[in-house]
Amino acid sequence: MNIEALKVFKESGEKITCLTAYDASFASVFDACGIDIILVGDSLGNVIQGDKNTLDVSMSDMIYHMQAVAKGTQNALRIADMPYQSYTYAEQTLTNAKRLIMAGAQMVKLEGGCEHEASFRILQGNDISVCGHLGLQPQSVVEIDGYRVQGRGKQGANKIIKNALALASWGVKVIVLECVPAELAKQVSQSVSIPIIGIGAGLDCDGQVLVSYDMLGVHVRHVPRFVKNFLTDNGDVKSAVNAFIKAVKDKSFPSKKYSY
């Protein structure tokens, strides 16, 4: 899988599938099932380290898990989260992004929009592929007082659309859009030429991502409305992953039950 293929998916209407992984074993299963993207997410702070948020995840943590996932992946596109406070200014962003690329990432993901323009631009200028993250941004949960649906009001919706347009203009290749009304996500997807991968953002995104532990029913925290347990009706992890991929590809997931 590569970035050009993701563009073709958007143009053709084929949905993109993405799951998080943090180790070689799960990564190899997901890869063998044909998942399009594996995201080494800072969600490891929640599901691996047992924290209430992702704020204590370090660059060392991300590098360790990225290296492990890279060893278990042959075909899926590998994206790594840049953790909290690892991209506060441009030069720091470039240094840390290079470390993740060296660890096996093919793309790095940054949360936020126009406030990080310098960081997005320096990565583009150094030919490092970037994934954006708009809507609910887990690294900002303290500032926004918890995990809440974003973009419900006109002002918030317009800000998300503005940021998506800006990110696309700065060379961002993909955007993860989290926890927003389905209608807003549809508008965002129609506003930009790059793929929009939703999580709690309705059916009209160009793809779907879930935290793998959530998708498999391994919960150490509150389960968001947008999470579906694919292991319940399937006998093993591989079958659950195949069911997730099929449901995304045939556009049966997420239904309204799992959307806002």
Swiss-Prot record:
Residues reported to bind 3-methyl-2-oxobutanoate: 42-43, 81, 109
GO biological process: pantothenate biosynthetic process
Active site: 178
HAMAP family for the chain: PanB
Enzyme Commission no: 2.1.2.11
Cofactor(s) annotated in UniProt: Mg(2+)
GO MF entries: 3-methyl-2-oxobutanoate hydroxymethyltransferase activity; magnesium ion binding
Protein name, UniProt field: 3-methyl-2-oxobutanoate hydroxymethyltransferase
Record family assignment: Belongs to the PanB family.
Cofactor note: Binds 1 Mg(2+) ion per subunit.
Organism: Vesicomyosocius okutanii subsp. Calyptogena okutanii (strain HA)
Keywords: Cytoplasm, Magnesium, Metal-binding, Pantothenate biosynthesis, Transferase
SUPFAM superfamilies associated with the record: Phosphoenolpyruvate/pyruvate domain
